[in-house]
């Protein structure tokens, strides 16, 4: 198979540009390796060079086990490119060797309260947070979406779901504090929550609940039947 020279490809078809636009998951192994190699030679495009490496070593595992000397023997690679490839593969190996992170599982509103109460109960301004969850209701991240005033916070669906998409969240639980200490939801709280639930349904990220934190007490809008 013949691969084109990168500069001859339309911008939207080039590996680096595609990765910036669509993410690494959209690229083939040859595309990713071409990005690592950066350039080809005067006779071979970087995509052809990447394909030649995979052809020689058969698969990613064999490529990762190759020594710098073995990589350097491929025409067009050389020691500099061999080191670049080996360094990137070593990072991947170390990541795979890391112990699995122990993540908190959210089973009920009390679990949420236990995570955020001490941080939010005494704040003098409203902080709007999202707990981003995976498909097993494990917490992937806790993100502060906005910081408002004494009695209000402005939350744009765009900003909320941009964070959730970036973290590959399957669902989320919304949290914000009432500096007054009273966790009773306002009409605005309920309207905003319903709006965010609707946005989540369109995007495919479920908003499971909205917890309001007061002074050592909280309200779950879902438990109260308000959403």
Swiss-Prot record:
Domain spans labelled MPN: 105-227
Pfam families: RadC (PF04002), UPF0758_N (PF20582)
Motif JAMM motif: positions: 176-189
CDD domains cross-referenced by the UniProt entry: MPN_DUF2466
GO MF annotations, alphabetized: metal ion binding; metallopeptidase activity
Positions bound to Zn(2+): 176, 178, 189
InterPro entries, sorted: MPN, RadC_JAB, RuvA_2-like, UPF0758, UPF0758_CS, UPF0758_N
The entry's keywords: Hydrolase, Metal-binding, Metalloprotease, Protease, Zinc
UniProt entry tagged with the keyword Electron transport: no
Record-level GO BP terms: proteolysis
Family from the record: Belongs to the UPF0758 family.
Protein name per Swiss-Prot or TrEMBL: UPF0758 protein Dred_2549
Origin species: Desulforamulus reducens (strain ATCC BAA-1160 / DSM 100696 / MI-1) (Desulfotomaculum reducens)
């Amino acid at each position: 198979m013949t691969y084109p020279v990168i500069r001859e490809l339309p911008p939207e078809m080039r590996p680096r540009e595609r990765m910036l636009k669509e993410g690494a998951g959209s690229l083939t192994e040859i595309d990713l390796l071409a990005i690592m190699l950066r350039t080809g030679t005067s006779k071979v495009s970087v995509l052809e060079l990447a394909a030649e490496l995979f052809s020689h070593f058969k698969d990613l595992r064999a490529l990762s086990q190759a020594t710098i000397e073995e990589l350097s023997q491929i025409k067009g690679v050389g020691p500099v490119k061999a080191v670049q490839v080996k360094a990137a593969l070593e990072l991947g190996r170390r990541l795979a060797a890391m112990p699995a992170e122990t993540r908190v599982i959210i089973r009920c509103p009390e679990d949420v309260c236990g995570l955020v109460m001490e941080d939010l109960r005494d704040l003098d301004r409203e902080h709007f947070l999202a707990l981003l969850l995976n498909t097993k209701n494990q917490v992937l991240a806790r993100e502060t979406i906005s910081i408002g005033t004494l009695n209000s916070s402005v939350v744009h669906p765009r900003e909320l779901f941009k964070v959730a998409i970036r973290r590959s969240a399957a669902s989320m639980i919304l949290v914000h504090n009432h500096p007054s200490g009273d966790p009773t939801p306002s009409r605005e709280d309920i309207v905003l929550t319903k709006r965010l639930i609707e946005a989540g349904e369109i995007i495919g990220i479920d908003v499971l609940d909205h917890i309001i934190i007061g002074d050592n007490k909280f309200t779950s809008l879902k438990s109260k039947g308000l959403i």
